[in-house]
Protein backbone atom coordinates (compact mmCIF):
# COMPACT_ATOMS: atom_id res chain seq x y z
CA UNK A 1 0.00 0.00 0.00
CA UNK A 2 2.79 2.40 0.86
CA UNK A 3 5.74 0.88 -0.89
CA UNK A 4 8.20 3.61 0.11
CA UNK A 5 11.58 2.19 -0.90
CA UNK A 6 10.07 -1.29 -1.29
CA UNK A 7 11.63 -2.99 1.73
CA UNK A 8 8.57 -4.99 2.86
CA UNK A 9 7.59 -5.84 -0.72
CA UNK A 10 11.09 -6.97 -1.72
CA UNK A 11 11.73 -8.93 1.49
CA UNK A 12 8.39 -10.69 0.96
CA UNK A 13 9.43 -11.68 -2.57
CA UNK A 14 12.83 -12.93 -1.38
CA UNK A 15 11.12 -15.00 1.31
CA UNK A 16 8.49 -16.42 -1.07
CA UNK A 17 11.16 -17.39 -3.60
CA UNK A 18 13.43 -18.79 -0.86
CA UNK A 19 16.32 -16.57 -1.92
CA UNK A 20 18.94 -16.68 0.82
CA UNK A 21 19.94 -13.38 2.43
CA UNK A 22 23.18 -12.07 0.93
CA UNK A 23 23.16 -14.58 -1.94
CA UNK A 24 23.99 -11.89 -4.49
CA UNK A 25 26.72 -10.34 -2.33
CA UNK A 26 30.37 -11.07 -1.76
CA UNK A 27 31.83 -11.09 1.72
CA UNK A 28 35.39 -10.43 2.88
CA UNK A 29 35.30 -13.77 4.73
CA UNK A 30 35.33 -15.46 1.31
CA UNK A 31 38.99 -14.42 1.07
CA UNK A 32 40.07 -15.94 4.37
CA UNK A 33 42.76 -18.59 4.15
CA UNK A 34 41.06 -20.71 6.83
CA UNK A 35 38.08 -21.54 4.58
CA UNK A 36 38.70 -23.07 1.18
CA UNK A 37 37.08 -21.20 -1.72
CA UNK A 38 35.31 -24.41 -2.77
CA UNK A 39 33.25 -24.31 0.45
CA UNK A 40 31.88 -20.88 -0.45
CA UNK A 41 31.23 -21.93 -4.04
CA UNK A 42 29.37 -25.10 -2.98
CA UNK A 43 27.22 -23.24 -0.46
CA UNK A 44 26.31 -20.56 -3.01
CA UNK A 45 25.40 -23.29 -5.52
CA UNK A 46 23.30 -25.04 -2.88
CA UNK A 47 21.51 -21.78 -2.07
CA UNK A 48 20.86 -21.24 -5.80
CA UNK A 49 19.39 -24.74 -6.05
CA UNK A 50 17.01 -24.00 -3.17
CA UNK A 51 15.42 -21.00 -4.91
CA UNK A 52 11.76 -21.66 -5.69
CA UNK A 53 11.72 -20.59 -9.32
CA UNK A 54 8.14 -21.82 -9.71
CA UNK A 55 6.77 -19.85 -6.73
CA UNK A 56 3.51 -18.09 -7.52
CA UNK A 57 4.29 -14.91 -5.61
CA UNK A 58 3.05 -11.63 -7.06
CA UNK A 59 3.76 -8.59 -4.91
CA UNK A 60 2.15 -5.25 -5.59
CA UNK A 61 3.13 -1.99 -3.97
CA UNK A 62 1.41 1.36 -4.17
CA UNK A 63 2.50 4.81 -3.16
CA UNK A 64 1.10 8.26 -3.85
CA UNK A 65 4.69 9.48 -4.33
CA UNK A 66 6.07 8.73 -7.80
CA UNK A 67 9.66 8.97 -6.55
CA UNK A 68 8.95 6.23 -3.99
CA UNK A 69 7.51 4.03 -6.74
CA UNK A 70 10.63 4.56 -8.88
CA UNK A 71 12.84 3.74 -5.90
CA UNK A 72 10.89 0.53 -5.22
CA UNK A 73 11.30 -0.57 -8.85
CA UNK A 74 15.03 0.20 -8.80
CA UNK A 75 15.51 -1.70 -5.53
CA UNK A 76 13.49 -4.70 -6.80
CA UNK A 77 15.78 -4.84 -9.86
CA UNK A 78 18.87 -4.76 -7.63
CA UNK A 79 17.43 -7.53 -5.47
CA UNK A 80 16.64 -9.67 -8.52
CA UNK A 81 12.89 -9.87 -7.86
CA UNK A 82 11.52 -7.41 -10.41
CA UNK A 83 9.81 -10.30 -12.24
CA UNK A 84 7.39 -10.86 -9.37
CA UNK A 85 7.06 -7.34 -7.96
CA UNK A 86 5.04 -4.44 -9.32
CA UNK A 87 4.87 -0.91 -8.01
CA UNK A 88 2.60 1.86 -9.16
CA UNK A 89 1.59 5.35 -8.22
CA UNK A 90 -1.82 5.11 -6.63
CA UNK A 91 -3.75 6.78 -3.83
CA UNK A 92 -4.73 4.54 -0.91
CA UNK A 93 -8.36 5.53 -1.52
CA UNK A 94 -8.22 3.54 -4.78
CA UNK A 95 -7.20 0.27 -3.10
CA UNK A 96 -9.34 -2.72 -4.12
CA UNK A 97 -9.19 -6.41 -3.22
CA UNK A 98 -9.17 -7.67 -6.80
CA UNK A 99 -8.18 -11.29 -6.08
CA UNK A 100 -9.59 -14.15 -4.00
CA UNK A 101 -6.76 -13.97 -1.47
CA UNK A 102 -4.18 -11.43 -0.48
CA UNK A 103 -1.99 -10.08 2.26
CA UNK A 104 -1.42 -6.40 2.92
CA UNK A 105 1.59 -5.50 5.04
CA UNK A 106 2.31 -1.84 5.45
CA UNK A 107 4.37 0.54 7.47
CA UNK A 108 2.53 3.77 6.65
CA UNK A 109 4.17 7.12 7.22
CA UNK A 110 3.42 8.43 10.67
CA UNK A 111 4.02 11.52 12.76
CA UNK A 112 7.51 10.59 13.90
CA UNK A 113 8.62 9.68 10.38
CA UNK A 114 6.97 11.77 7.69
CA UNK A 115 3.54 13.13 8.52
CA UNK A 116 2.24 15.16 11.38
CA UNK A 117 0.02 13.26 13.80
CA UNK A 118 -3.24 14.70 12.40
CA UNK A 119 -2.32 13.65 8.84
CA UNK A 120 -1.35 10.18 10.06
CA UNK A 121 -4.67 9.76 11.88
CA UNK A 122 -6.59 10.83 8.75
CA UNK A 123 -4.62 8.25 6.79
CA UNK A 124 -5.52 5.54 9.34
CA UNK A 125 -9.21 6.41 8.95
CA UNK A 126 -8.95 6.03 5.17
CA UNK A 127 -7.14 2.70 5.61
CA UNK A 128 -9.95 1.48 7.88
CA UNK A 129 -12.45 2.33 5.14
CA UNK A 130 -10.59 0.66 2.26
CA UNK A 131 -9.09 -2.35 4.09
CA UNK A 132 -12.44 -4.06 4.56
CA UNK A 133 -12.68 -7.55 6.02
CA UNK A 134 -12.84 -10.11 3.22
CA UNK A 135 -12.49 -13.89 3.42
CA UNK A 136 -8.99 -14.85 2.26
CA UNK A 137 -7.48 -11.43 2.96
CA UNK A 138 -5.40 -10.16 5.87
CA UNK A 139 -4.03 -6.74 6.73
CA UNK A 140 -1.03 -6.00 8.95
CA UNK A 141 -0.11 -2.43 9.81
CA UNK A 142 3.01 -1.29 11.68
CA UNK A 143 2.72 1.98 13.60
CA UNK A 144 3.77 3.53 16.92
CA UNK A 145 0.42 5.33 17.26
CA UNK A 146 -1.40 3.98 20.31
CA UNK A 147 -4.64 5.49 18.97
CA UNK A 148 -4.39 3.52 15.72
CA UNK A 149 -7.32 1.17 16.33
CA UNK A 150 -9.57 4.07 17.28
CA UNK A 151 -8.68 5.96 14.08
CA UNK A 152 -8.82 2.80 11.93
CA UNK A 153 -12.30 2.04 13.25
CA UNK A 154 -11.77 -1.58 14.30
CA UNK A 155 -9.95 -3.42 17.04
CA UNK A 156 -7.15 -5.62 15.71
CA UNK A 157 -7.62 -9.39 15.73
CA UNK A 158 -4.08 -9.65 17.10
CA UNK A 159 -1.35 -7.23 18.18
CA UNK A 160 2.39 -7.64 18.56
CA UNK A 161 4.96 -5.26 20.02
CA UNK A 162 7.99 -4.58 17.84
CA UNK A 163 10.59 -1.95 17.14
CA UNK A 164 11.07 -0.17 13.83
CA UNK A 165 14.64 0.92 14.35
CA UNK A 166 14.53 2.68 17.71
CA UNK A 167 10.80 3.45 17.48
CA UNK A 168 8.52 1.31 19.64
CA UNK A 169 5.63 0.15 17.45
CA UNK A 170 2.71 -2.24 17.31
CA UNK A 171 1.89 -4.66 14.53
CA UNK A 172 -1.89 -4.55 14.16
CA UNK A 173 -3.20 -7.68 12.42
CA UNK A 174 -6.64 -8.02 10.85
CA UNK A 175 -7.58 -11.42 9.44
CA UNK A 176 -11.15 -12.26 10.52
Segments from the language model and where they lie:
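Conserved S-adenosyl-L-methionine
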Residues: 1-95, 112-113, 119
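C-terminal catalytic and target-recognition region of SAM-dependent MTase-like enzymes
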Residues: 91-176
